[in-house]
Swiss-Prot record:
It is found in: Cytoplasm. This is Ribosomal RNA small subunit methyltransferase H. CDD domains: AdoMet_MTases (cd02440). S-adenosyl-L-methionine binds at residues 46-48, 63, 90, 113, 120. It comes from Brucella ovis (strain ATCC 25840 / 63/290 / NCTC 10512). It comes from the Bacteria. The gene is rsmH. GO terms for cellular component: cytoplasm. GO terms for biological process: rRNA base methylation. Belongs to the methyltransferase superfamily. RsmH family. Specifically methylates the N4 position of cytidine in position 1402 (C1402) of 16S rRNA. One of its GO terms (molecular function) is rRNA (cytosine-N4-)-methyltransferase activity.
Length: 346
């Protein structure tokens, strides 16, 4: 269930080709056209952005990873005046649009690919992979607390909650207690050190397709980068900046994120009941209508060609003329976890 999505890279001689997941389905749902302005909130290796630019639309591409932005400069030159790269969190995509196009500017589409780029997974020094030895980092950018900070400084109960909720790890408590005992003697600093310790503790069933550390590494990455909070705020920001008729397309790679997107579109289409924050007596006009039926997955051919696409799901909505609804983060049911910015000071 690891969230290993995004652009898939393959070496072809000296050149690297990037194969984005569900690209045909994304373009079909997004419907970019010449002269349209599309926000790619998760630029990564630029796979979606390139295909959108090839339709004649202009792109504002956002990524919090400065390495991705720097790698995209060549594409910026290839499409002069039509691609604007912005180093930013995608939760602030409305601010990025205002910076590039002016306050109050609306756009024709937003696409979000909620997964880790294979470029990040494949770079051992980024610390995302339990299959390659590297520093226990996992940050999308160089700012903020690292996975090592979380593993070595969080309370055992907090670690267990993170592993359980963000990784759906059934051995969460046992792993958290093992970490507490081990770090007292020697802090965890390397990816393989943590991965091997987890494998030694819980064992490895030959029938299991995934490594025993998969869910813990996923949980730490999601926690360190506040990925669920980022997604929630990005969905609300997209609602604010889309024109009537504009399209929001979101690709997710595991169930936590997909449930959030599904809940958002259901709520914005008027499919949810009232809550204590928004009573049923309050008339709410829908801000989105469905652009696709349910969730769209990869074809068998794409799964065969790109195994990382197997867990991908696409959901999409079309912005109505009604005003954005309330920015209510409680809609997403996010857990209360320790703030990552407190770790470096603890």
């Amino acid at each position: 269930m690891a969230s290993l999505g995004g652009d898939n890279s393959q070496a072809e001689g000296a050149e690297v080709r990037h194969v984005p997941v569900l690209i045909a389905e994304v373009i079909d749902a997004l419907k970019p056209a010449p002269g349209a302005v599309i926000v790619d909130g998760t630029f990564g290796a630029g796979g979606y952005t390139r295909r959108i630019l090839e339709t004649g639309a202009d792109v504002i591409a956002i990524d919090r990873d400065p390495t991705a932005i720097e790698a995209g400069r060549a594409m910026e030159k290839e499409f002069p005046g039509r691609l604007n790269l912005v180093e930013s969190r995608f939760s602030a995509l409305d601010e990025a649009v205002a910076r590039m196009s002016g306050a109050g500017k609306k756009v024709d589409g937003v696409v979000l690919d909620i997964g880790v780029s294979s470029m990040q997974i494949d770079e051992a020094e980024r610390g995302f992979s339990f299959q390659k030895d590297g520093p226990l980092d996992m940050r999308m950018s160089s700012r903020g607390s690292s996975a090592a900070d979380a593993v070595n400084r969080l309370k055992t109960g907090d670690l267990a909650r993170i592993f359980n909720f963000l990784g759906e790890e059934r051995h969460a408590g046992r792993i958290a207690r093992m970490i507490e005992k081990r770090r007292a003697a020697k802090p965890f600093t390397r990816t393989l050190d943590l991965a091997n310790a987890i494998e030694t503790l819980v064992g490895r069933n030959p029938k299991d397709r995934i490594h025993p550390a998969t869910r813990v590494f996923q949980a730490l990455r999601v926690y360190v980068n506040d990925e669920l909070g980022e997604l929630a705020r990005a969905l609300l920001a997209a609602e604010r900046i889309l024109k009537p008729g504009g399209r929001l397309v979101v690709v997710t790679f595991h169930s936590l994120e997909d449930r959030m997107v599904k809940r958002f579109f259901a709520d914005r289409a008027g499919g949810s009941a009232g809550s204590r924050h928004m009573p049923e007596t309050h008339m709410r006009l829908p801000s989105f209508t469905p652009a696709v039926k349910g969730a769209v997955g990869p074809t068998p051919e794409e799964e065969e060609r790109n195994p990382r696409a197997r867990s991908a799901k696409l959901r999409a909505g079309i912005r109505t003329e009604n005003s954005p609804l309330e920015d209510d983060l409680s809609l997403f049911g996010l857990p209360k976890l320790p703030e990552t910015n407190e770790l470096a000071r603890s």
